[in-house]
């Protein structure tokens, strides 16, 4: 017993860092155990703080994330939320706990490389599991194309969240200029193609749009920030073009883009008529436009927000008034995190949320941090199409990686 305690004391930082590395891979594969994994990290952090192995060093982004949780907590009291709203607060707890943990995290280059590797490994395992599930589905139902797409393919995480995980892996692999994360070049190419081409199976509109934006923006930033990397830019464009060409070879995806553009055009011409004339069953893009319209009205009616846990009631009321009782029964969220936060916490909450994004974009630009910039851009794009911090998958992924990457500084930042 004494030997074990002595060993833990002498090797605390090794145990601590390896626990974070294990967390970054295990929560992806076993999301139901993410709470237990976080509790273990909390216990380690408390132990390290007591023994003065760790020091509390939050930055503006981490404090703002914790403040966002505080705003959600406060809204329960200011808007007289029901006790059932506590379950929504439980989902938001990661907004407090993860930034708090990372505020103690002694970010070092070596350990961060291992975190990146662990995330990539987790994504590869998820891809393997997804193909296994799809294969079993095709054996049972014989519908091979349907079985290998969207929710049939991604059964552990929602396809949009899985898409975000994979794009982050693609970015990490391709922007590893020093070749330290994945030293083997052929393996880097395989990992890049694997994490990129699976986007076809996921069918996430936000994911496709993000890939296009990254193709347009990142090579320019590489030229501005680093210079002299023509081969990197060329290979990046070629590989991504191959990936996008493969993605758009699907008639289903091209039809999805076409329908989305058509719906947006009709909606802009006359929003009220568009909503009234929708017939069931609704397509996904139709549903989004209706939900955005309704939730925006709630934001304007309640500039201070309706509070955490109360939005479903207000959404249902507005949808029923528009003749969409069937949609109201589904209790969908707004499918837009910016609108969701404004509806729940008011415009003050939106400003707090935007402050996190703006701060991270500023430090990414000033410190020439391409991976952080790409992750923030990913967060913005996905938040435009999904309420990304409503589920644990989105909260943990973005909170963890935005928090970790925000802890870099010019002295110990990873050379990317």
Segments the model singles out, each with a brief description of its role:
Residues 1-87, 107-113, 117, 176-186, ...:
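Transmembrane signal-anchor hairpin modules in multi-pass inner-membrane enzymes, especially those
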Residues 278-345:
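Long extracytoplasmic/lumenal interhelical loops at the membrane interface
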Residues 50, 220, 229, 321, ...:
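Hydrophobic transmembrane alpha-helices and their immediate junctions
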Residues 29-38, 87-91, 153-167, 206, ...:
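Membrane-interface micro-motifs in multi-pass membrane enzymes
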Residues 41-45, 171, 211, 215-216, ...:
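Transmembrane alpha-helices of multi-pass inner-membrane enzymes
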Residues 40-42, 95-103, 161-175, 399-405:
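Hydrophobic cores of alpha-helical transmembrane segments in multi-pass inner/ER membrane proteins
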């Amino acid at each position: 017993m004494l030997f074990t305690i002595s060993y833990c004391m002498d090797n605390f930082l090794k145990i601590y860092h390896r626990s974070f590395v294990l967390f970054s891979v295990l929560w992806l594969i076993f999301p139901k155990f993410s709470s237990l994994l976080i509790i273990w990290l909390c216990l380690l952090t408390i132990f390290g703080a007591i023994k003065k192995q760790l020091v509390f060093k939050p930055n503006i982004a981490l404090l703002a994330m914790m403040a966002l949780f505080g705003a959600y907590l406060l809204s329960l009291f200011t808007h007289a939320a029901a006790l059932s709203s506590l379950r929504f607060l439980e989902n938001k707890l990661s907004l407090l706990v993860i930034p708090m943990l990372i505020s103690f995290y002694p970010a070092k280059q070596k350990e961060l490389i291992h975190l990146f590797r662990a995330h990539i490994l987790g994504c590869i395992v998820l891809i393997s599991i997804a193909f296994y599930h799809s294969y079993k589905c095709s054996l049972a139902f014989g519908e091979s194309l349907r079985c290998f797409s969207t929710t049939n393919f991604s059964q552990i995480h929602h396809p949009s969240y899985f898409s975000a995980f994979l794009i982050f892996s693609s970015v990490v692999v391709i922007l590893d200029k020093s070749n330290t994360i994945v030293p083997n070049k052929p393996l880097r190419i395989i990992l890049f193609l694997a994490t990129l081409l699976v986007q076809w199976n996921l069918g996430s509109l936000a994911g496709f749009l993000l890939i296009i934006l990254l193709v347009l923006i990142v090579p320019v930033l590489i030229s501005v920030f680093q210079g002299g990397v023509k081969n990197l830019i060329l290979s990046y464009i070629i590989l991504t073009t191959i990936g996008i060409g493969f993605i758009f070879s699907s008639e289903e995806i091209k039809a999805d883009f076409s329908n989305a553009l058509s719906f947006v055009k009709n909606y802009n011409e006359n929003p009220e008529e568009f909503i009234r004339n929708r017939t069931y069953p609704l397509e996904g893009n139709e549903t989004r436009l209706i939900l955005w319209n309704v939730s925006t009205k709630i934001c304007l009616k309640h500039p201070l927000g309706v509070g955490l846990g109360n939005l479903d009631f207000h959404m249902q009321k507005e949808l029923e008034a528009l003749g969409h009782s069937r949609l109201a029964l589904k209790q969908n969220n707004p499918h837009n995190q910016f609108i969701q936060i404004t509806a729940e916490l008011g415009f003050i909450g939106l400003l707090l949320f935007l402050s996190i994004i703006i701060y991270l974009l500023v430090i990414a630009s000033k410190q020439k941090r391409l991976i952080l910039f790409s992750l923030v851009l990913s967060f913005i794009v996905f938040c435009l199409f999904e309420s990304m911090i409503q589920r644990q998958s989105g909260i943990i992924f973005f909170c963890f990686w935005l928090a970790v990457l925000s802890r870099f500084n010019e002295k110990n930042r990873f050379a990317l």
